[in-house]
Each structure stands twice: as C-alpha cells, then as structure tokens.
Regions:
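Proteins enriched for Cys/Gly/acidic motifs involved in redox and nucleic-acid/cofactor modification
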Residues: 1-213, 226, 256, 261, ...
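Short flexible coil/turn linkers enriched for glycine and charged/polar residues
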Residues: 150-154, 164-166, 267, 277, ...
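Conserved strand-turn element in the central/C-terminal portion of the radical SAM core barrel
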Residues: 167, 171-178, 242-251, 277-288, ...
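Conserved, mostly hydrophobic/aromatic
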Residues: 168, 188, 205, 245, ...
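Short glycine/threonine-rich loop-to-helix capping motif typified by GTGT followed
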Residues: 217-221, 258, 321-329, 358
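Radical SAM/AdoMet-radical enzyme domain recognition
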Residues: 228, 236-237, 242, 254-313
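Contiguous mid-protein beta-loop-alpha structural module that forms a pocket-lining wall or clamp
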Residues: 322, 337-339
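Terminal RNA-binding accessory module
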Residues: 357-477, 483, 487-490, 498-501
Length: 501
C-alpha cells in the first residue's frame, strides 16, 4: 500500500479528474494523504490555461523532489500541462516518473503501480524507463464516472463531456482536451442516481462548453437541444434537490435553455456566463462569435424569464491589441450587467495559439493597471449584490462546518452564494431557510430556520478522506476576509470556471 498525495490546479473539470484518479487508487488498496511530506507518490494534476498555473506546478514539483532523499518516491504530472508539454517535462524535472495526459486518467493507477515496482528494484533514473502517455483514447469521455465521496458529502461534480471545438484564439483547451465528445444521457443519469443513493443532493454538470453537450452525437427533440434533454432527464431523478452546470458559452444559450430555468425547479438560479471582453473588436479577434449587444440581449432574456438569476463571468484584460477604448467598453458592459462576481485575468500567452503570435502585445504594466481597475468595479458590484440579501431569507444547502471555525456551518444558496451561520451537525445535508444578517463582498452571514424539522436523508457513509484538490490559477486580486478564503473563494487566486470559456 502506498500513500498518495494529489494536488490539483485549475478548474472543476480538473478536480473531477483528480477524484476519479483517487477513487481508482483507493480501490487498489492505496491511501490518499493530504500530507505531501509522508507521500510515496506525488501526483500534480495541472492546468495550462495561464502560464502562472504551469509555473506553480513546475515549482511545486521541483520543491517536492527533496522527498526522494528520504525514500523512493514516484512523481507524476497529470492533465493539461502534461498533455501539452509531454516528454519535454523530463528535461525540466529530472526526478519525474510519469507524464499522463487528459485522455488517460483511467490508466494512472496502473502506471503508478508500475513505477512503484520499478522504484522498489535497482535504482534507475534514466528517462527511458519513465512513463509518458498523452495519446488520444477513444471514448475517454466515459472513463470519468466513479466518485470518492467523503462521509456526509452532499454535492458532487458529474463530467458529461470532454473537449472543445470553438478554438478561441487565446485558448489552449482544444489542444489539451481534444475535440468535443459527449457521454450518453442514460449513462449520466445512472451516475447521478448512484450519487443520490449515496446521499448527494446537488450535482454540477461539467463540460468545457457544457451547453453544447451532444450536438455532434444526439438529435434535437421537439426543438430541445441534447443539453436541455439531459437537464430534463437529470431533473427526473428522485431525491436530487439541485442541478448546476458549468461552464457554458453564450452561443449555446438558445430559447429552450433559457426557458429550462423556469420549467425545471431543480435547476438553480445561477449561470456562469463567460464574457471575456465588452469590445466587439476584441471579441472578433478572440473568435468569440458574439457581439456585446448580443451578449446583453441574452442577459436580458435570461433575467426576464428568471429575475432572481445570479450571474458570474470570466473577463480577460490586456488581450493583444486591446486599446483603452476597448477596455472602457468592457467596463461599461460590466456596469450594465452588474455581475454577482467575476474572474478577471490578465491575458497570458499560450504556445501555438493564434493570439500568441500577434505583434501588438499589451505591456504587463498596463495589463496590471486594467486588471486592478476592473477588479475594483467587479468587487463593488459583488458587495452591492450581497448587501441586497441582508434581511432576506434564502434557501441554503448546508455542506458542512466552516473551515475557519468548526462551530459554524456553511452552505450555498441556489444562486451559489456562500453562507456562514450557527447550527448543529444535524443540519448538514439539509435545505435550510437562512435569514441573512450581514454580508461581506463574497460571503453572506445569517441565522438558520430549518425548512423541515425531520431527519436529513441518508448521507454518504464510510471513512474515506474528503479530498481537497483545489488551487486557483487565476489573477483576481481582491482582498476577501479570512472566512471568504477558507470557505471556497480566494480572490487573490480566483479559480476560473472550466477552461476560462
């Protein structure tokens, strides 16, 4: 039995992939440890959306090489950076043993055991004995389906597709994740049913561009897209209370999806709606396929059908050629929409993407100035939106203790607002009415009034360690309070939605 340390950089899809890897390792008798210093195996699941994420992973792996002075340790890079850099990573990290790409997560446990066996024999550091697998795998989209749930866990990610065909000019995701591939609806529904049987009450459906699910594999039915058909099928699962999805693309928001927020009560009032820029000129250069006017029209259509809709977004500042006029257009659109929150990132060159070769690159100093200016506007809107909840009662799914004070509980509203409140362990897994008493920029605080006095439904059993795979890779630079950071939002390293779509 080996002790395995897994650290994840990047989006929710990466977190879900890490969970799959952990589940397979546990099934083979290995132990997942949160303590890197006691690990026999170190796996870093990587992100390539921005250079900062890659540098963090490379730096971490370099530092952890010191463990091998104490005992044999297997080191592996997984995921997007592994896919994009491949065998070249061995030149940067000499002690590396494994490089496994985005379509081979289901092979990681096997490769780890091969490397462990090799380490137990005569010492061999030659790169020829290392394992590299970044090849395409048919039907790999169906390989991420098993879960490692903690005791009393009530939310889960469900991967419904892989890949992206949009080829935005700034984005490396189509190169690291491949073309769009979707799982069958019945397979996804079966996974959700198994999760509900184990105590899960909320699922988040994941895809690089999640609302384009199934467009190449499955037909429309009565004007409903395959994604809306999937939402309807998941909605019919007994015992499930909430459905979320991320990350969509504006091009996939058609009338049937907008109306689904009204017709499907389990579909929560929150949408992450990537903008990237408020300038039509920059949107064309990004190959985003919509205009600022079209984006605002979609926002208005969504809010007409669902007035309580919470909206978050992704924005890139300093894209090549961005002028002050372009940036002011972005600020104006942000002010027009009034987002509940936004992940704001400085443009990062990605190798082999069209934008990287543009000569008119924006200076780093100007990127930083625009980043801070836009963040001030975003944070102001976040505070205003949250202040509007003071004195109101909201429905909260209680997820567990606050990470800074186990005597307090935390959960999320249907609009994905973090709420911290006083309560008891029996509230975990329950839907509660919480009266909001005060708010910070990113967290609501309140007093509970349970919807039901009865016992909560059966919760996930067992003693498996709840895995903590999260590490943001973004560039949002606000200053949330200590409670905000601990309960899932640190704006100094704001995690992007999937692939920063």
């Amino acid at each position: 039995m080996a002790k395995v340390y897994i650290k994840t950089y990047g989006c929710q899809m990466n977190e879900r992939d890490s969970e799959q890897v952990a589940r397979m390792l546990v099934e083979r008798g290995h132990l997942i440890t949160p303590h890197e210093n006691e690990a026999d195996v170190v796996l870093l699941n990587t992100c390539s959306v921005r250079d900062l994420a890659e540098q963090k992973a490379l730096g971490k792996m370099g530092m952890l090489g010191a463990l091998s002075r104490q005992r044999p340790v297997v080191y592996g890079f997984l995921g997007c950076m592994a896919q994009s850099r491949g065998e070249s990573l061995f030149k940067e990290i000499p002690h590396l043993d494994l490089v496994v790409g985005t379509q081979k997560f289901h092979r990681v446990a096997e490769y780890v055991e091969n490397a462990l066996a090799r380490k137990a024999g005569p010492r061999m550091d030659d790169v020829r004995f290392s394992i590299v697998d970044v090849e395409e795998e048919p039907d790999s989209q169906g390989s991420i389906r098993d879960h490692l749930l903690s005791e009393r866990q009530v939310t889960a990610f469900v991967s419904i597709m892989q890949g992206c065909n949009m080829h935005c000019t700034f984005c490396i995701v189509p190169f690291t994740r491949g073309h769009e591939r979707s799982r069958p609806i019945d397979q996804i529904v079966d996974e959700v049913k198994r999760l509900v049987d184990r105590g899960i009450r909320e699922v988040t459906l994941l895809g690089q561009i999640v609302n384009l699910y199934g467009r190449h594999e499955f037909p429309k039915m009565d004007g409903r897209s395959p994604f809306v058909q999937l939402l309807e099928a998941v909605h019919a699962v007994d015992g499930l209370d909430r459905i979320r999805f991320t990350s969509p693309h504006p091009i996939g928001f058609r009338k049937d999806l907008v109306e689904a927020f009204h017709s499907l009560p389990k579909l929560v009032e929150h949408v992450h709606f990537p903008l990237q820029s408020g300038s039509d000129r920059i949107l064309r250069a990004m190959h985003r396929t919509y205009t600022a006017e079209k984006y605002i029209k979609l926002v208005d259509e969504i809010r007409t059908v669902t007035p309580e809709m919470a909206m978050t977004t992704d924005i890139i500042v300093g894209f090549p050629g961005e002028t002050d006029e372009d940036f002011q257009s972005t600020k104006a659109l942000v002010d027009r929409v009034g987002f509940d929150n936004a992940f704001v990132f400085k443009y990062s060159k990605r190798k082999d993407t069209p934008a990287a070769s543009v000569l008119d690159q924006v200076p780093d100093r100007l990127k930083e100035e625009r980043n801070q200016e836009l963040l001030a506007l975003v944070n102001d809107w976040a505070r205003r939106r949250n202040a509007g909840f003071i004195g109101r009662e909201v429905e909260v799914l209680c997820e567990g203790p606050s990470k800074t004070n186990p005597a307090r509980l935390m959960g999320r509203t249907r609009g994905n607002k973090i709420v911290v409140f006083e309560g008891a362990s029996r509230h975990i897994g329950q839907l509660l009415n919480i009266r909001i008493t005060h708010a910070s920029g990113y967290t609501l605080y309140g007093e509970p009034a349970p919807v039901n006095a009865g016992a909560s439904p059966a919760l996930a059993q067992g003693s498996l360690l709840r895995l903590s795979f999260r590490l943001g890779c973004g560039g949002q630079d606000g200053a949330p309070d200590r409670e905000d950071r601990a309960n899932g939002f640190d704006s100094s390293s704001g995690r992007p939605e999937i692939g920063n779509r």
